[in-house]
Amino acid sequence: MNKKGLLLVNLGTPDSPHPDDVKAYLKEFLSDTNVIQMPRLLWQPILRGKILPKRSFKSAELYQKIWRKDGSPLMVYAKKQVEQVQQLQPNWIVRCAMTYRKPNIAETLKEMRLAGADDIVVLPLFPQYSVTSTQSVIDQVRKADKNINIVKSFYNDEAYLDLLARDIREAWAKNDYDRLIISYHGVPESYVRRGDPYVDHCTATTQGVLERVGPLTPDNTHQVFQSRFGPTEWVKPYLSDTLRSLPSQGIKRVLVATPAFVADCLETIEEIHVENHDIFKQAGGEVFDVVQPFNEHIDFSKYIASLANRHFAQN
């Protein structure tokens, strides 16, 4: 009887918040040609000469603010998700890996094979597919082991939408909010023009939430994008611009949800809770609350196990 294996993959995190480790992480991340779609001969001198020397120290300061005693929040939650799924499915071999830094995807797959996993499903923890995230996982997996089933997205999966809508519904009911802000990680506009379906996937997720949460409509919900990097145009509207403009329209009480992030990380803890919170308050906003990502919620781990089971069945 074949032994099943499940590999959960997220983006990655530095080994520590020290500038040298942050630099190593950023170098690997920003050298990925799926992420930065420029000729290497043009991009690498810019990356090594200008971006890494400055951004490594700035990012290290941010990581130092969010780092926990037990490590990077993203890694902490990744391990807890693995533990929970392993408890739910004791006969599986369940592991986590990161697209960048450690644990390495290829090395983890090899270890799973040696442990006896014959039938492996890889689940990138990016609900909405993008060339900049999911495709890099696919490329690494295919290079390491071609006989593996990969879940390419789950942005419109009914069970995922039900979980997401439940959390948003419960949070919305706790206060008298003027608007729900649904914020997704952004991508360059040029990538979408070249065929990346990411924005369509985001819009479908937003629509799925609206269909499930009665009080929400297109009139009291904004879909926006965050985490812009560099001088080029990214998909709009930008989260920061939206938050600056709302208070002057009398919209001063907002709830923010981040469906693209299944676990807390720098983009949610620092960028949402601190930077964008301050932007909204400085513009005259009064209430700024955030729907927590799934993190270690057991219902999400049950969903992961169920989703993987469906993909095992397809093999």
From Swiss-Prot:
Keyword Transmembrane included in the entry's annotation: no
Q: Which domain of life is it from?
A: Bacteria
Under which pathway is this protein filed?
Answer: Porphyrin-containing compound metabolism; protoheme biosynthesis
Which SUPFAM superfamilies does this UniProt record tie to the protein?
Chelatase (SSF53800)
PROSITE patterns, per database record:
FERROCHELATASE
**Gene Ontology process terms (BP):** heme biosynthetic process
Q: Where does this one sit in the cell? A: Cytoplasm
Assigned keywords, A-Z: Cytoplasm, Heme biosynthesis, Iron, Lyase, Metal-binding, Porphyrin biosynthesis
Q: Which residues bind Fe(2+)?
A: 185, 267
Pfam families named in the record: Ferrochelatase (PF00762)
Record keywords: Cell membrane included? no
Q: What is its main location?
A: cytoplasm
Its Enzyme Commission number?
Answer: 4.99.1.9
InterPro entries given in the database record = Ferrochelatase, Ferrochelatase_AS, Ferrochelatase_C, Ferrochelatase_N
GO cellular-component term (any): cytoplasm
Q: Which reaction does it catalyse?
A: Fe-coproporphyrin III + 2 H(+) = coproporphyrin III + Fe(2+)
Q: Which GO terms describe its molecular function?
A: ferrochelatase activity; metal ion binding
What family is it from? Belongs to the ferrochelatase family.
Main role? Involved in coproporphyrin-dependent heme b biosynthesis. Catalyzes the insertion of ferrous iron into coproporphyrin III to form Fe-coproporphyrin III.
> What is the name of this protein?
Coproporphyrin III ferrochelatase
Query: From what organism does this protein derive?
Result: Leuconostoc mesenteroides subsp. mesenteroides (strain ATCC 8293 / DSM 20343 / BCRC 11652 / CCM 1803 / JCM 6124 / NCDO 523 / NBRC 100496 / NCIMB 8023 / NCTC 12954 / NRRL B-1118 / 37Y)
Q: Which gene encodes it?
A: cpfC
